[in-house]
Amino acid sequence: MKSRILVALLVVLLSGCDSKPKAPFGFEWGQTVDKTISQDLKGVKVSDKDGFIAFVSADSAPEPVQYDGKYFLSFTKGLGLTSATFSTGVDKNGYFFNQGRTIYNSIAQKLEEKYGKPKKVTEYVERDGNEFYECIKNESCGQWAREYSKDGMKIILRVESKYGSLIDDFPKGDVSVRYEYLTKEMIQKVNSVEEKKEKSNNF
């Protein structure tokens, strides 16, 4: 009887050792840049690997989504992976928010199934039709985004216009979904380490 109780307690303790939520695209919150590079992703590019914030971009993921696009990962020193974004270009063949709307709504439905109703919806434009993408270049004219939250994760789905002049036969915008996992405790941990460095005097 005692042994069964001990086993049960051990299972509970082990299950509580890693309470991080599941990260998207087959990645893991807290994983390192080196582990990410070892995952054989296509088109991997790394910048500021040894900096406070490191960045990795790739054309694939361990568990890719159904659309073609790019994956952007951010790593915080001492914490590992803290944000992951997928972005896909839309409406290459026109200036209306057509393909983009279809993909945006499809992703929104999938996010709602997994994370529940969005906590914030900001979807408005003063100029629609073939001016939609020009309008959302300026937040005072329009924005198209939804924000979700679950288990300490913040998820933002948004539509953004391409920079500069919009050109025929090129995507007019991007639909992206960004996941961030950075709790207050994690921020305090990083700040504590940085404060100790600043206070140290080894001269």
Identify the residue ranges that each predicted region occupies.
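Non-cytosolic coordination micro-motifs
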Residues: 19-57, 89-203
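Residue-level detector of functional hotspots within protein domains
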Residues: 3, 57-59, 67-70, 132-134
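Sec-dependent signal peptide recognition
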Residues: 2-8
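Mid-chain, structured segments of secreted extracytoplasmic proteins
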Residues: 61-105
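C-terminal motif of bacterial Sec signal peptides marking the signal peptidase cleavage site
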Residues: 13-16
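Membrane-embedded hydrophobic alpha-helical segments
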Residues: 9-11, 111
